[in-house]
Design a protein with these regions (language model features):
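Residue-level detector of the transmembrane beta-barrel scaffold of outer-membrane proteins
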Residues: 21-25, 56-58, 75-81, 113-117, ...
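Membrane-embedded beta-strands of outer-membrane beta-barrel proteins
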Residues: 24, 46-48, 66, 101-103, ...
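Surface-exposed strand-loop-strand hairpins of Gram-negative outer-membrane beta-barrel proteins
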Residues: 32-44, 88-95, 171, 204-209
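Mid-chain, structured segments of secreted extracytoplasmic proteins
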Residues: 60-92, 216
Length: 227
């Protein structure tokens, strides 16, 4: 928290407006084979960022998701989303999808843009249970074609989700994460995006028989076209 407070003291070069627009592209991500694995893999990832008057699609809030939302108060949006959910080959869990609700508040802390998201995710396969995310992102620099933000997230999971992913255990706080993400204008139309974060497992996920590391790191980069 002290580091975050220092970042918020950056001068007025911090962005007050959305600099990114609509993005579509592709990249790669270095991640553990599953959350808690000691082995890493490189996987292709989409880069999506679209906000219409009602519909949206994005990969900028931790998962690939799309849906509809509406601004009910200034800066406060409520909506519904369909999201892609990762599988786990170690426990024979196939990738799937979830349906959920979210509330997102966009405001400022001084000159810095702040976004706070609460999101529920109910897996379409009822045996996989539910998850809930609380995520906050704050912009810390914007200038010279670059944008940098820090983010933190906490995710909770039901008993069913923990057992389907880790083979045993009970629900509760699943993981917490802290990271940095950014974008850089390669040209007026092309944007380089990147992200790095650490993820810490908690509860029965951390003590699962298949958990080899309680802390994992994720790195991603890619190029997107700005419409």
């Amino acid at each position: 928290m002290r580091a975050l407070a220092l970042l918020l003291l950056l001068p007025a070069t911090v962005l007050a407006q959305d600099p990114l627009g609509t993005l579509l592209g592709a990249g790669v991500r270095l991640r553990p084979e599953y959350d808690g694995s000691s082995r890493e893999e490189l996987q292709p990832i989409p880069i999506v960022r679209y906000y219409g008057r009602v519909l949206f699609a994005r990969t900028t809030q931790g998962i690939l998701e799309g849906g509809a939302r509406s601004e009910v108060l200034r800066g406060l949006n409520l909506g519904v989303q369909l999201a892609f959910e990762e599988g786990n080959d170690r426990t024979g869990l196939d990738p799937g999808a979830s349906l959920g609700l979210h509330a997102e508040w966009d405001t400022k802390v001084g000159p810095a843009p702040l976004s706070v998201l609460f999101r529920t995710r109910h897996h379409l396969d009822s045996d996989r249970g539910n998850q809930a995310d609380l995520r906050a992102t704050v912009g810390v620099y914007g200038g010279h074609g670059a944008f940098v933000a820090v983010f933190g997230q906490a995710t909770w999971a039901s008993d069913e989700w923990v057992r389907s992913y880790y083979s045993t255990g009970e629900g509760g706080l699943l993981f917490s994460a802290l990271g940095v993400e950014g974008a850089y204008d390669l040209s007026s139309r092309w944007v380089l995006v990147w992200s790095v974060h650490g993820r810490w497992l908690h509860g029965d996920a951390a003590s699962s028989p298949i958990t080899e590391r309680k802390t994992n790191y994720f790195l991603s980069t890619g190029v997107a076209y700005r419409f």
